[in-house]
């Protein structure tokens, strides 16, 4: 997949996420064999399993103060999306962090997604 196409896809993912349509991004851009590794280091594999984990976290958020896109970069078949987040999670507390989402692309879809802070 060409860098220009990945860049276009990343821009669409960011727009969907910021407009509350993250599920649409999952349907369109994530590979069936996706592996997601979140900030806690836990690996979740398979497209059907990742959204349920995401919904669990999203359902526990009690307040959002900041959710903003801080930048993106594409190099080869890898994209980097930087997010600034500040929100409260039930039974966890405040999560305030700048995180980098690193995505590897295969066949026009994200095959691996890792988060670092």
Task: Spell out what each predicted region is.
Residues 31, 90, 105-107:
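Short, acidic, Ser/Thr-enriched surface-loop or helix-capping motifs
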Residues 65-68, 82, 94-101:
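Short, surface-exposed coil-to-beta transition loops
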Residues 4, 23-77:
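A solvent-exposed, acidic/Ser-Thr-rich amphipathic alpha-helical stretch
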Residues 1-29:
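Short, low-complexity N-terminal intrinsically disordered segments enriched in polar/charged residues
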Residues 72-78, 104-109:
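A short, structured loop/turn motif at beta-sheet edges
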Residues 98-117:
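Short beta-strand edge/turn micro-motifs at domain boundaries
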Residues 30, 85-87, 101, 117:
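Short beta-strand segments enriched in hydrophobic/aromatic residues
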Residues 60-62, 86-96:
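Short, cysteine-centered beta-strand-loop-beta hairpins and adjacent loop/turn segments enriched
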